Structures are given as structure tokens and as C-alpha cells.
Curated annotation (Swiss-Prot):
Protein species of origin: Salmonella typhi
Gene Ontology cellular component list: cytosol
Gene Ontology terms for molecular function: 3-deoxy-manno-octulosonate cytidylyltransferase activity
Known EC number: 2.7.7.38
Enzyme class: transferase
Pfam families listed in its UniProt record: CTP_transf_3
Assigned keywords, A-Z: Cytoplasm, Lipopolysaccharide biosynthesis, Nucleotidyltransferase, Transferase
Reaction(s) the record says it catalyses: 3-deoxy-alpha-D-manno-oct-2-ulosonate + CTP = CMP-3-deoxy-beta-D-manno-octulosonate + diphosphate
Main location: cytoplasm
GO process annotations (BP): CMP-keto-3-deoxy-D-manno-octulosonic acid biosynthetic process; lipopolysaccharide biosynthetic process
Function: Activates KDO (a required 8-carbon sugar) for incorporation into bacterial lipopolysaccharide in Gram-negative bacteria.
Pathway(s) this gene product operates in, as recorded in its UniProt entry: Nucleotide-sugar biosynthesis; CMP-3-deoxy-D-manno-octulosonate biosynthesis; CMP-3-deoxy-D-manno-octulosonate from 3-deoxy-D-manno-octulosonate and CTP: step 1/1; Bacterial outer membrane biogenesis; lipopolysaccharide biosynthesis
PANTHER family (alphabetical): 3-DEOXY-MANNO-OCTULOSONATE CYTIDYLYLTRANSFERASE, 3-DEOXY-MANNO-OCTULOSONATE CYTIDYLYLTRANSFERASE, MITOCHONDRIAL
Name of the protein described by the UniProt record: 3-deoxy-manno-octulosonate cytidylyltransferase
Amino acid sequence: MSFVVIIPARFSSTRLPGKPLVDINGKPMIVHVLERARESGAERIIVATDHEDVARAVEAAGGEVCMTRADHQSGTERLAEVVEKCGFTDDTVIVNVQGDEPMIPAVIIRQVAENLAQRQVGMATLAVPIHSAEEAFNPNAVKVVLDAEGYALYFSRATIPWDRDRFAKSLETVGDTCLRHLGIYGYRAGFIRRYVSWQPSPLEHIEMLEQLRVLWYGEKIHVAVAKAVPGTGVDTADDLERVRAEMR
């Protein structure tokens, strides 16, 4: 099947300045992400960035770059600019791969594209089971609950679903119903155009989760269990050191 990968790579980061260009074992992080995307079989891979240094690093590795504005409020808005500049048709399948995921398995990039292509839905994503209480109660681990057909009912930083009987006895174990959302999305290009035409929703501001805008406006998001679990993403200097060790 045919799909396009877009990798947003914003240069500024409060916790890790210049994050796309941090060195991981001799290569900029964004180049590692580009290489994982190439392994997915995508027809085209575009790095969307607001910084010339990132563009130069990607082009030196043989990658394609689309320069974008620096004032986007979300990654989806940056994708929308790329969709318009490249003139993608509404039915083009786009996979958004985060630029700080150098250990993302290529198999799940393709998985989310295939899941979207097989359904009449504008957006698809992935999740993995949560097995530890620490992760279940961590607000940085976004949880998702699904309906009987595998569509998202809600995403939250809170612990959902709340296992009333289990948690009344102990907060140290979790059952088998808790899922952690992975920050990888598949969209049809036309859906991205619609998304950015909607006003932000109150829920996305409360939770700071932009995918809640989709549910707020009554649209569906398909969620499948990922075929592989991604390695550590890079948000902080500690994450960076951990990834360097894991990729050595």
C-alpha cells in the first residue's frame, strides 16, 4: 500500500534545546528517526522543520525537507502546512512519526497506515497494554479506553478505566484493561485539513491532548494494539542518555 510519513521536528524545546540535532552515537537524532521511517516501506518521507540546521542535517542524510512556520501550536498544524505545500490529495494516507522517537519500530509505522487504509475513518493510532501501577498513575503516560469495535472513547492523563474494586484494595497492581496511547497517528490528508479548521476544544486544553479535538467534534479514532513496543522517546537529558546506552 502507499503512504507518506511526515516527521515534525521542531527545533525549540524547553527541556532539551535543539533536540532534533542531539547526537546519538554519531548521528543526529532526526536522522535515526528518518532511517526507521525508511524501513517502513513508506512511498515518501518528509521532515517538517522550522530550522535550517535541522534541514541541512536531513538533506545530508539524503532526506526530504519541508520548511514550516515556527509558530504552530501543535504537530498536527505543522502537518497541515506540509499537506498544503505538497498538494496531497484528500485520500492520501499520512503517518505522523514523532521526531523524538529514534527507536520507533518500523513495523508499527506501517501498521498504523494499514489500519487506517482498511477503515472508513479519518484517523488511526496505536496503544500498548499497561502492566505497572507506576505507569498507570503517571500523568505523562496517556491512557485510552476503547469501545467494542476498537474506537477510542476517551484519552486521558488520568488512570482510566478506574478499576473501582481493585483500587479499593490496593493501588500497587493493575488489571489487563489499561492501555497506554502511543504518539503515532495515521490520517487521510483531507481529515488533517478538516481538523485544523475546527476550533480547539475545552477538553484538549484541560488534558493538553490535541487528539481530544477529534472526539469533541464527534469523529472516530481507530486504536489497535501495537505489534511492537517502541523504545524510549527523548524528552529530557536523562532520556537522551538512556537512549544512547540502549542504541549503543
